[in-house]
Amino acid sequence: MNHAVHNKLVSFIWSIADDCLRDVYVRGKYRDVILPMVVLRRLDALLEPTKQHVLEEVVFQKETMKFTEWDDKGMTAASKYVFYNTSEWTLQSLHGSATNSQQILLGNFEDYLNGFSANVQEIIEMFKLRAQIKHMANKDVLLDVLEKFTSPDINLTPFEKLDTAGRKIPALTNLGMGYVFEELIRKFNEENNEEAGEHYTPREVIDLMTHMVFDPIKDKIPSVITIYDPACGTGGMLTESELFITDEEGKIKATNTSVYLFGKEVNDETYAICKSDMMIKGKDPEHIKVGSTLSTDEFAGTKFDFMLSNPPYGKSWASEQKYIKDGKDVIDNRFLIKLKNYWGEEEDADAVPRSSDG
């Protein structure tokens, strides 16, 4: 992606907060609107070309087949993605039909959100997006924000388009969208220093980790790789690992290697960012799970080729110990290891660390 275009796009999105959200949100809460709206606009843009096909599938399932619930296979086949939207609306049509009534716009916007498939509904809930659009409508800025995100002067779509002056704006690839999203996250993290350490690992640290893990095997990269991060945050470590392996301008250049990313994140908003980032980049979003890695194990029995992580060191996890130990007995097999005793016989050993390393 052209860096000048990338920087212009990030700057435009960043300016939306100052132009529309000042005095509506405190500065530290701008991200609560901007990040989910970026995700929403991108997903909306991806679905636009197949919108009519999805609406035809809606009629077929509802009127011809008399289905009481949507058949996901039919819907995703129509949308060409693992997600879909069954409403009549797009963000462009919401803006195009808007009047001065913020409440009418709010009602239409809610219908639009309700039309998304279950995997996107989860992201909407985690972002608390319905509450945000209601707040913006009540403050008379919802239309202003929508106008910015559908402006012809920025391109969050995967297609080349013309701006208001007739100049071509390049298409935004999935990789380019990932760069834009990660740059926005980085800027918001810098703005909110008190939160940065909770879900952000500096890019140079991730770069060092990927070198340490993958450099030694750069000449032995298999055709299929699985990578897991049990405290994945916004997914930066996962996506950077894949990029380090497959980048045609990188050291390894394993462009034909299929990389499958898996992660788990305990914070709802951070999980939503990670999962939506995977969607935006065309990865399988169902490989990202929400919850504590310590208390639940959605990947039980799964083996991964590599694991990279930067867990929240210094944070007590005493409240989750009950899921791992019952008194002195270890009840989670992940924390039992086989060790040989003095006579060379294998025995189960307790590998549970202290509940606080602070």
Predicted regions and their residues:
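Glycine- and acidic
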Residues: D18-L21, A165-G166, E190-A196, I227, ...
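Intrinsic-disorder/low-complexity loop/linker signature
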Residues: K62, K73, G166, E249-G250, ...
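Aromatic-residue hotspot detector
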Residues: V39, L47, M75-A77, F83, ...
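Glycine-rich, flexible loop segments associated with nucleotide phosphate handling
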Residues: K168-M177, P222-I227, A254-L261, P353-G358
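Mobile active-site "lid"/loop adjacent to the S-adenosyl-L-methionine
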Residues: A254, G314-G358
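Conserved S-adenosyl-L-methionine
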Residues: H199-S309, G314-D329
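Tryptophan-centered motif/residue detector
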Residues: W14, F83, Y271, W317-A318, ...
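Non-catalytic, mostly N-terminal accessory regions of nucleic-acid modification and defense proteins
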Residues: M1-I217, H287-E298
